């Protein structure tokens, strides 16, 4: 895993400033602590930070073709690089390394921008074509690896993280009111937007081409849900799922450095580890982390799976100094991000890095296999709509009349909404919903965001799905929104914070293409989520794991806010700086904090959002050059004592 950064000036007579390129690249040094490299030519500058995984001796970047006219910087892994390399050699290409990076260089020579169709993996890369003066940026199909860009006067800047772009003086630190509204609705800012005006996320499965002063984007892949009604038997689907899982895991075990897996004891990570056992001639290293807090420790479940499968199991209990960690999290995410599971993700990544350089995880199992509660609720609501017909809307109107504190009122309200809006609303549950935002915002800020709809992205994705099955549509929405901008963003930043490469076998694009063809009835059956995944895991792990209810990857933030985070929260929310931003109603902020501290109500998610927002403001907006100044602090994260071994 690595970090990339660069600048392209359309005018070849306008050179890229080397010191600026070095600063952009150094901003992501945590992503690649092993080596750094640069390429500068007429109007182009490419920078790279390397975390060595494959071809340790000769895989440094930037890396070019035979005559140097093509240059590549690359973050990620091409898992089928050996297969593509063999094809390219047959076409007459000559290789001087064994790295997957060189496959990109020669692949571009052979197929141009369509080379991405050949690649199987997680990637974000830049290709410079010196002869054509063309820059190509590409991001993998699911958005596992991040890539940001900004058009600036006379050129384009890009990088693995926003902080690289902020090192360029032509990139303004101007925040967007609509993006802030989206954050308070969802916990994150959906692609292609960022909190910064002019900075964009390159969407997954997209290529960007910059040449002759023009920039164009094109999409090269999408998930195609078909409804899965092709007459095949359940056993046929089960057999094919087994084959896809076996291949996806085997491909991700290719490494020249120590490799293991993060294990929670849930269905997804247990599935990955079970197939790792099949693919390895020695017990795989597995790591689990729990908290010293009742109800937030999954180590016992993980140990049950690990012992049953014969793994080399390592369990640690985190004793987080969360008040010291949160400013570092704000720095690593670059923009407001409030999924509190970033905290346990950071600690499990840190624990894993003590033992391995590459860790496989179970991320992706929920989105395409109906693993979330909202999938079951969506399925129930659709059945009720079908059974009640017009009466469903009457039930919905009743829900509108009831306060949300009344049990079941929210589900009744959803019955009155169109299915696309009902599912979009599920993503905002527990955060600042429209009524809550109306109370939270100042009158001036309310006017600024009037007419903006943070949920439009979800409705658009709902209708873009090729299947009419409501459950298929809801899973497609999750795969194109929440999974990319929340789950994968969290995993990438927290693993890269400690220079750990995370790999997600359940997000293999061929496995996902298969999942999209599986009937929804084999994902959610008799009220049981992930039905087919559970079946493939049956007889591999104890029944207690198969039948275990999903618990999520949570942290005890309600108690942290009343305990170790209370002084910081009090200062961040009430010292006047937040009030002076003119965004919020000060009395509403005070009410939320007072009610939570006194246990009158639980506002943990909303308060967490406000805390992370204010930390971001202070790091990236209030302090000129703040992103760079925080580098040393973030670098110290690796030295913090955060976990103690329980067993090994």
PLM regions and their residue ranges:
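Cysteine-centered catalytic environments shared across enzyme families
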Residues: 1-333, 345, 349, 539, ...
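Adenosyl-5′-phosphate
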Residues: 1-4, 8, 23, 41, ...
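Residues that scaffold the ATP/ADP-binding catalytic core of kinase and kinase-like folds
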Residues: 87, 168, 368-371, 514
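Active-site adenylate/phosphate-handling loop in enzymes that bind or generate adenylated species
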Residues: 141, 347-405, 482, 487, ...
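Acceptor-binding helix/loop patch of EC 2.4 sugar-transfer enzymes
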Residues: 162, 381, 534-535
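Glycine-rich loop motifs involved in handling phospho/adenylate chemistry
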Residues: 259-268, 293-294, 340-343, 368, ...
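Short secondary-structure boundary/capping segments
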Residues: 330-332, 373-380, 627-628
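Short, flexible loop segments at the rims of nucleotide/cofactor-binding pockets, characterized by
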Residues: 334-339
